[in-house]
């Protein structure tokens, strides 16, 4: 089972360079591919980032709002136009504003080609946005996205074309089997909606095995998507704690492997 990592980025070049240096230090030999979705005219500012990547793909220009809500389509375009030519069994999807302080294998030891692991995965009917750990969810549906017009469009489309159970997720990263990437990239383009429910629902409908669990209490204490950005002092304090499943998100500032003790 050979992993690769897709590093998605669009701003803060120096921070991106330091993230990649940390990833390289913690995961020697790991292929790391880049997906740039920023302004085309600013790609030249990221020459140092590109030097640290095994490959770099530039996504066609889109608004920040579109890119955020269609992250699954962004990744699928990368796979169709570039990723399918790279060898890997499963793919880590890692955004530039995430900092992992432990090797990837501490979080996910391995994955089969037809599997998906999303830490926040749960049935849509049980999505309580107040509870991050899906295994501790109240089972009561409370999610603001369900009130958006685009969800109604998705729901209508889903009933007509699939009708299978709906899933959703809010996660700091995703780990996707290669076969999942291939099937999804062929089928996703006509499906309306938002990536946080479209991706897991469609992946499952296409035969992916969805995985849950495997994350420590420390992981869920550290991951708070709505928190204020981590400060450098907070990150350095966490870096001095014992290894485990340590992560910081969002964290926007550069910090070197030497500072972190990697």
Give the location of each predicted region.
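Short beta-strand-to-loop acidic/aromatic patch adjacent to the donor-nucleotide binding site
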Residues: 87-97
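Active-site-proximal specificity loops/subdomain of glycosyltransferases
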Residues: 36-89
């Amino acid at each position: 089972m050979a992993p690769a990592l897709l590093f998605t980025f669009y701003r803060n070049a120096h921070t991106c360079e330091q993230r990649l240096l940390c990833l390289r230090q913690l995961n020697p030999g790991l292929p790391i591919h880049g997906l740039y979705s920023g302004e085309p005219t600013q790609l030249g500012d990221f020459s140092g980032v590109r030097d640290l990547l095994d490959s770099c793909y530039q996504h066609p220009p889109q608004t920040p709002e579109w890119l955020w809500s269609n992250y699954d389509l962004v990744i699928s375009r990368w796979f169709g136009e570039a990723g399918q030519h790279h060898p890997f069994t499963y793919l880590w999807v890692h955004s530039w504003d995430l900092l992992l302080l432990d090797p990837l294998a501490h979080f996910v030891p391995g994955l089969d080609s037809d599997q998906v692991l999303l830490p926040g995965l749960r049935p849509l009917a049980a999505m309580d946005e107040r509870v991050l750990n899906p295994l501790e969810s109240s089972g009561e549906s409370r999610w603001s996205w369900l009130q958006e017009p685009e969800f109604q469009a998705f729901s209508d489309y889903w009933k007509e074309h699939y009708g299978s159970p709906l899933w959703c997720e809010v996660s700091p990263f995703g780990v996707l089997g290669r076969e999942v990437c291939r099937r999804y990239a062929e089928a996703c383009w006509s499906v309306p909606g938002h990536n946080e429910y479209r991706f897991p629902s469609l992946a499952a409908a296409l035969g992916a095995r969805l995985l849950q669990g495997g994350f420590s209490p420390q992981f869920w204490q550290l991951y708070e998507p709505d928190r204020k950005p981590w400060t450098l002092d907070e990150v350095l304090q966490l870096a001095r704690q014992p290894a485990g499943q340590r992560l910081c998100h969002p964290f926007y500032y550069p910090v070197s492997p030497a500072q972190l003790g990697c």
